[in-house]
Amino acid sequence: MSESVHTNTSLWSKGMKAVIVAQFLSAFGDNALLFATLALLKAQFYPEWSQPILQMVFVGAYILFAPFVGQVADSFAKGRVMMFANGLKLLGAASICFGINPFLGYTLVGVGAAAYSPAKYGILGELTTGSKLVKANGLMEASTIAAILLGSVAGGVLADWHVLVALAACALAYGGAVVANIYIPKLAAARPGQSWNLINMTRSFLNACTSLWRNGETRFSLVGTSLFWGAGVTLRFLLVLWVPVALGITDNSTPTYLNAMVAIGIVVGAGAAAKLVTLETVSRCMPAGILIGVVVLIFSLQHELLPAYALLMLIGVMGGFFVVPLNALLQERGKKSVGAGNAIAVQNLGENSAMLLMLGIYSLAVMVGIPVVPIGIGFGALFALAITALWIWQRRH
């Protein structure tokens, strides 16, 4: 069955506003919960190497449910899928508040996030299309990064005051996201009537993976976004250990302020990409990707707070300019070939596999005692080389 299209071309329709508000609150909860739960692990004397494990169980849920969540997003009204997913996040955050093992609660939040992602991005192609899709992605990324900015800081600051208050604030944010989802128009399902046989769904997902991988443009987008988000998540945990070593600061809030600088930069970079890059000129984003790695390397050598703030903001600007066009390219090409929900689910598999791999390597490096500054230097250099190799490959093909 061909994919249905339900498009309102206005960037500020009622449906788009509801999506942006819901995304802000959901992402706010995600980021506040990460730092609140990290503070809980510190308070309960978990070892340092267990910190990235928290994120690994989260992304593990993405990988486990990757064959199914794309079809869920395309088989039901995406706004209702988003509401159900935020309900799962609310349940996970509440369970941590009530003393359930934080790794189990965070895994449940990961399941909700896995179901949420294909729907939140797939709905953009139903609310707008064509040249405005890049701008819609810019709005989505700006909302997400604003939530990262405020959520990360709120999680750290509230955790310094009282960990339980920080966790409760996360649950309230997810509750607000559920309410906002109610106001998203109930559009017809994009691809209703598909088989729910798990074996067939897995086979269909693998076919979608193969289809997107065989297309040069979507393969390029998948590799680029996977490298970016894998590196971005690893950088967040690197900062948690880097701050006390390089700056001599041991509170919960300083790493969140530094993460906020990255978030501010991504908002700026996403806005610039929406104005300067189109689907036909996506390769313009590649130099920014290389510079991310170079600046991370320079950042790792800093010992003063102000240069650290400036360099992290620059990393964010480069990151926003790099990833927004790649997201839009995958959505536009993927919607036509395998469906928007399936395309985003495949993207999630790639991104979260990269996160799992990079976090695993980082956790292992910390466990064996490699100092955090050399880890940062090697991390930045390898990322710059990887994006350079991707650009060379893209130009040759």
From Swiss-Prot:
Ranges per topology, Periplasmic: 1-17, 74-90, 166, 248-256, 302-304, 365-366
Gene3D superfamilies referenced in this protein's UniProt entry, alphabetically: MFS general substrate transporter like domains
Bilayer topology: Multi-pass membrane protein
InterPro entries reported in the protein's UniProt record: LysoPLipid__transptr_LplT, MFS, MFS_trans_sf
GO molecular-function term, one example from the UniProt record: lysophospholipid:sodium symporter activity
Superkingdom of the organism of origin: Bacteria
UniProt keyword annotation of Membrane present: yes
Transmembrane segments: 18-38, 53-73, 91-111, 145-165, 167-187, 227-247, 257-277, 281-301, 305-325, 344-364, 367-387
Keywords: Cell inner membrane, Cell membrane, Lipid transport, Membrane, Transmembrane, Transmembrane helix, Transport
Localization annotation: Cell inner membrane
A GO term from the CC aspect: plasma membrane
Primary location recorded for the protein, binned into one broad class: membrane
Topological domain spans for side Cytoplasmic: 39-52, 112-144, 188-226, 278-280, 326-343, 388-397
Entry similarity comment: Belongs to the major facilitator superfamily. LplT (TC 2.A.1.42) family.
HAMAP family the record matches: MFS_LplT
Classification via PANTHER family: MACROLIDE-EFFLUX PROTEIN (PTHR43266), MAJOR FACILITATOR SUPERFAMILY (MFS) PROFILE DOMAIN-CONTAINING PROTEIN (PTHR43266:SF2)
Function: Catalyzes the facilitated diffusion of 2-acyl-glycero-3-phosphoethanolamine (2-acyl-GPE) into the cell.
Listed name of the protein: Lysophospholipid transporter LplT
Organism whose genome encodes this protein: Shigella boydii serotype 4 (strain Sb227)
Lineage: Bacteria, Pseudomonadati, Pseudomonadota, Gammaproteobacteria, Enterobacterales
Gene name linked to the record: lplT
